Amino acid sequence: MHAPMPLLLTGRGFRRDLEANGCLAVHAPLEGGAETRLLRRLRGAGYRTRMTSARGLGDPEVFLTQKHGIRPPHLGHNCVGRGAAVGEVQQVVPLIGDLLDGDDSVALWILEGQVLSRSELLSLCDLCKREPRLRIIVEMGGARSLRWQPMKALLGA
């Protein structure tokens, strides 16, 4: 007779490391599921959570925390008119601005983090230092099993 299988991941060690370091680099199984399991555990611990992709993020700090302008993609020959050749600037609210309202801790999970440069990843670590309620998890690629480490350790900073 086999013993019952224990829970695969309670999230306590992950949460402890996240709170100690602020910014974690994660390698998750490619079949998925680990992200939502961990985010559910963080929500249960009182975090407000959001998941986004690193692709198209632009300047991470500005896109995450400040109101900023974007232009529509350039589609070739357009009438210049009153806007620039690439269109009018549209103001966009920050991705996590609404999550930072209140006193709750915030966890942001960034998918496809391997497309970010070293300086962009370091700026995410600095952002966690400046905003003590913010915790950032950056998925840096796939692995056979879930593993994580402090982002600064991955970058050698």
Curated annotation (Swiss-Prot):
NDH-1 shuttles electrons from an unknown electron donor, via FMN and iron-sulfur (Fe-S) centers, to quinones in the respiratory and/or the photosynthetic chain. The immediate electron acceptor for the enzyme in this species is believed to be plastoquinone. Couples the redox reaction to proton translocation, and thus conserves the redox energy in a proton gradient. Cyanobacterial NDH-1 also plays a role in inorganic carbon-concentration. Belongs to the complex I NdhN subunit family. Keywords: Membrane, NAD, NADP, Plastoquinone, Quinone, Thylakoid, Translocase, Transport. It is an enzyme of class 7 (translocase). This is NAD(P)H-quinone oxidoreductase subunit N. GO terms for cellular component: plasma membrane-derived thylakoid membrane. It is a peripheral membrane protein. NDH-1 can be composed of about 15 different subunits; different subcomplexes with different compositions have been identified which probably have different functions. One of its GO terms (molecular function) is quinone binding. It comes from Synechococcus sp. (strain CC9902). It catalyses: a plastoquinone + NADH + (n+1) H(+)(in) = a plastoquinol + NAD(+) + n H(+)(out); a plastoquinone + NADPH + (n+1) H(+)(in) = a plastoquinol + NADP(+) + n H(+)(out).
